[in-house]
Amino acid sequence: RLATLKMEGREKSAIATPHGLIPLAAVNRRFDRTWPTDTLELITSGGLKDLTAWYIATGRQALETMTDDVVSANALRPSPLYRRPRKIWGIGLNYADHAADLSEKTPTGIPGSFMKPDTTLIGPGDAIRIPDLSQKTTAEGELGVVIGQQCRDVRAEDWLTMVAGFTTIIDITAEDILRQNPRYLTVSKSFDTFFSFGPQLVTPDEIPDVSTLEVSTVLNGRVHAKNVVANMTFSPAFLVSFLSQVMTLLPGDIISTGTPGACVIADGDIVECRISGFLSLVNPVVDFKGPGKK
């Protein structure tokens, strides 16, 4: 499990252990390794595969000797896992219950999908900003799939070999803009701060069965909606396979697989994405239209 922390003015990778986070730079020094300490570079270079293999073979035990290198997550600010993915794919209405929330039908043959710019991206604890142009903004907890290698025309049964890991995501929508016209989907999804990403990347070896993961949208500590991955209309396996038939997928590309339900957010709210076995992603909400918020 990887996290990204802001250390000495730079965002660097760290490995999660039972004792806390150990900077990857410290691991490199201790074990004479050269893994990239930037999380996106670690993925794109193929270094994450080597790091995972080392961790499974001997690294998990070896890290137990590095308690002096553990940094407190409270002492350093967590960051998004990385900031410049080549692609952010979002999947809409992938749970029937969420489609009903919007008085829509779940797509059948082809998943409803959209893309988001990387300027939407924020990390744990960063403020989600409700923009002037929206009077009704919603937040959605989602499972994120991070692609681990360049791939095209992936068979569904091979999907997991193309995945670097999984993470928690909060996707934001200016719902009132979307409801005006479905062609406004891209605009409604593309405001700054409308995609929170992190705090940990969980590699596939840590998850016995992705389909059993429970995904929840939580508002102010109360579960607004939850469902399990098995109930998705389009499974993560299908999504990786299908999207790879549309375009080449690249290391670090993100697929946000859809939400069990969206909640309307307002100034002062706390939004959370919970996924069973994952560290939760939490973000406060600020409304730009509030007094003194400009």
Residue ranges and their predicted role:
Residues 83, 123, 138-140, 250, ...:
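Residue-level recognition of short, solvent-exposed, well-ordered loop/turn junctions
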Residues 16, 105-124, 139, 272-277:
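Structural signature of FAD isoalloxazine-binding scaffolds in flavoprotein oxidoreductases
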Residues 56, 71, 75-77, 98, ...:
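Catalytic-pocket segment enriched in acidic/His residues
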Residues 3, 77-80, 101-104, 128-137, ...:
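A generic local secondary-structure boundary/capping motif
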Residues 119, 124-159, 169-172:
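Non-heme Fe(II) oxygenase catalytic core, chiefly the N-lobe of the double-stranded beta-helix
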